[in-house]
């Protein structure tokens, strides 16, 4: 019985505040869309791939130990690619107006497990700049690794290219709108229940019975002011007339 009453109160609150819920949800959804399309700067991503292969020598066959060694080196290479030794040279070569740390924040270096392929991904507000940075990093790394580690086992597998109509990786307007809708709906429902909780006026017999734990014997209807005034004047005139007859 308590559960049904509670559910009834919940539905009653939602119904009573439905306009508030709709307005807040719509406003949040619209704000999410406007921010996604007009306020946030699009970010583009481009990637290049390098291959860590066996050392270049006169042997044509690939030894298992060579592959294992290259796989172990990949983690080291991932760190070196994002080090100032490489990034400072990239900044100098491209004439970028940023620090090596700022450039580092734009770069993601990854590789699949047991794969000799390393992916270098760069994010930037300009798709062409992202591609240029990725390709320059790969080129500089290929040149520098021979002197840094005295090895020559890196080759560029594929270069970053810019499509005719590049798509930004962020923001994602549809996702942002969906999140804004969900947040607006949840927030508006929470606000509705908060307002209902702060409203301590008694609006029904059921509320009064629940609050005082006593039965309601009857109710007094609300009398309109005009009717109340008319009845008051009518009663006053009747009393006056009665008083006059009594005096006679």
From Swiss-Prot:
Not phosphorylated in vitro by YwqD. The keyword Transmembrane applies. It comes from the Bacteria. GO terms for biological process: capsule polysaccharide biosynthetic process. Keywords: Capsule biogenesis/degradation, Cell membrane, Exopolysaccharide synthesis, Membrane, Transmembrane, Transmembrane helix. Pfam families: GNVR, Wzz. InterPro entries: Bact_polysacc_biosynth/exp (IPR050445), GNVR (IPR032807), LPS_length_determ_N_term (IPR003856). Pathway: Capsule biogenesis; capsule polysaccharide biosynthesis. It is found in: Cell membrane. It is a multi-pass membrane protein. Belongs to the CpsC/CapA family. Required for YwqD kinase activity. May bring YwqD and its substrates into contact. Probably involved in the regulation of capsular polysaccharide biosynthesis. This is Probable capsular polysaccharide biosynthesis protein YwqC. The lineage of its organism: Bacteria, Bacillati, Bacillota, Bacilli, Bacillales.
């Amino acid at each position: 019985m308590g559960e049904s009453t509670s559910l009834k109160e919940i539905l009653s609150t939602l119904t009573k505040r439905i306009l508030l819920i709709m307005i807040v949800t719509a406003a949040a959804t619209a704000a999410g869309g406007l921010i996604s399309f007009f306020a946030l700067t699009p970010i583009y991503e481009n990637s290049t791939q390098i291959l860590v292969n066996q050392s270049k020598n006169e042997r044509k066959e690939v030894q298992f130990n060579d592959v294992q060694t290259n796989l172990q080196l990949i983690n080291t290479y991932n760190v070196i690619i994002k080090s100032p030794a490489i990034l400072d040279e990239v900044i100098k070569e491209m004439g970028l107006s940023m620090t090596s740390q700022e450039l580092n924040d734009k770069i993601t270096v990854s590789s699949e497990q047991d794969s000799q392929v390393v992916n270098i991904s760069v994010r930037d507000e300009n798709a062409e700049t992202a591609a240029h940075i990725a390709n320059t990093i790969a080129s500089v790394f290929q040149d520098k690794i021979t002197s840094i580690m005295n090895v020559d086992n890196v080759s560029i597998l594929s270069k970053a290219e810019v499509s005719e109509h590049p798509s930004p990786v962020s923001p994602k307007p549809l996702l942002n709108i969906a999140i804004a809708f969900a947040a607006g709906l949840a927030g508006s429902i929470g606000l509705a229940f908060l307002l209902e909780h702060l409203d301590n006026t008694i609006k029904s017999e059921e509320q009064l019975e629940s609050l005082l734990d006593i039965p309601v014997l009857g109710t007094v209807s609300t009398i309109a002011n005009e009717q109340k005034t008319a009845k008051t004047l009518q009663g006053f005139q009747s009393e006056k007339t009665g008083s006059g007859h009594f005096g006679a």
